[in-house]
Amino acid sequence: MRHKYEMQLRKLHAEMIEMGTMIEQAIETAIKALVAQDTELAKKAIEADDAIDHQEREIENLCLKLFLTQQPVAGDMRNISAALKMITDMERIGDHASDISELTLCMAGTPYIKKLEHIQQMAKETIVMLVSSIEAYVNADEKKAKSVIEHDDVVDDLFDKVKNELITMIHENPDDGEQACDLLMVAKYLERIGDHATNISEWVHFSITGEHVD
């Protein structure tokens, strides 16, 4: 019985890794489409969100099956409960990647008013946070989970840079206001992705220690 249970837990971890990979690719595709102003790629990124939603439902079903059929002990129950919480944040990350691509479509055909280097850096940092949070969950690595939580400040600082740059540009040239607002929303979605990655790591911390992060 325990062997079967451990096999199902390994399957859960594999499905979590798969969902994490899907979301990582979604962010990368959304940013690639944004930078290149590639509308076809942006549309593909939006369509990919359905697969992420499906993966969330698959993991939900697996977690509920584990609860109902295996009677998990306290530590395993925290692990499964954390997975259910984590996939909610993961699904929201997928939504935000899709939102970025929607904005790419809105800005298509118009040259950017600024370089996107800080936005690209934000995306890289959020991907690092996401991948590390999933690794922390699968490997029960409390130290790595804490490092992700601390890393959120890096993303927040980059967001502040983008925001301040865009506000200055609006003041200097109000005609750039519409695109500046769209780019600010892109940065805001990336900042939220960082927040969701932080939430994931906080649930990882709970699954390992049984304690919530202050």
Kindly give the residue locations of the regions a language model identified:
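Cytosolic, long alpha-helical scaffolding segments
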Residues: 1-214
